[in-house]
């Protein structure tokens, strides 16, 4: 019998009074599936990788935000210069009188929407608070834990203000072109995406945007879109009874044979093999 790897508080928190800490991953290596006896917020700064959360794969890159409950199981694979930070916390140790339940999806149970995105503005402000939080949580001086918890509360509220669903920026958003491009790509799972049209609408240089995207994510635009679609296909193959031809259409592939070729190249298995193997987990 294979035992689930579990990360424990005693290995990450300085004392049983500490409620919050910061765990840097510069860069994040491949990490086997695991759970914790604490919760965490995960913010991705740059690079890319495959994050599998409760059997759902996400192709992650800059701006991705996850709320991870202690009971959630997750892993990292196929990482490429993936830089992220884990803000870890113990719900039962928090003393500040905030509506933690309302502010943090899945605060008390593994439920709610775990995956969100942050634009460049939110990321910049979050990075500043996390820097202060990291400093306070490593101090052995009076009121360090209280200061860290205050900063954690500020961070949680900031994330609430700036986060948005992966495929939908707020209509009044003033985020950067790169943020808008990643959102448009996430909204193009089922429909074709035309970069030239996007650049015409945004009055920007296609060449410059391609360079900026690759610099920040470590992928080309086409690679990212293809891998996001394959991740969605993996989820549908495991959790739905749709025909493979229908899944191909749902994931933006007009030809099911081409879908099978791409899927096999990205995962090392045909769609049928993937479905069979992963259906045994359910």
UniProtKB/Swiss-Prot annotation:
DNA-binding region range list: 196-217, 244-267
Keywords for this protein: Activator, Cytoplasm, DNA-binding, Repeat, Rhamnose metabolism, Transcription, Transcription regulation
Residue ranges of domain HTH araC/xylS-type in the record: 179-277
Subcellular locations according to the entry: Cytoplasm
Main location: cytoplasm
Single biological process term from Gene Ontology: rhamnose metabolic process
GO cellular component entries: cytoplasm
InterPro entries registered for this protein in UniProt: AraC-bd, Homeodomain-like_sf, HTH-like, HTH_AraC, HTH_AraC-typ_CS, RhaR_RhaS-like_N, RmlC-like_jellyroll, Tscrpt_act_RhaR
Annotated site location: Interaction with sigma-70: 246
UniProt-listed PROSITE patterns: HTH_ARAC_FAMILY_1, HTH_ARAC_FAMILY_2
Keyword Cell wall biogenesis/degradation (UniProt): no
GO molecular function: DNA-binding transcription factor activity; sequence-specific DNA binding
Domain of life: Bacteria
CDD domains per record: cupin_RhaR_RhaS-like_N
NCBIfam families: PRK13500.1 (NF010025), PRK13501.1 (NF010026), PRK13502.1 (NF010027)
Quaternary structure (record): Binds DNA as a dimer.
Known role: Activates expression of the rhaSR operon in response to L-rhamnose.
Protein name according to UniProt: HTH-type transcriptional activator RhaR
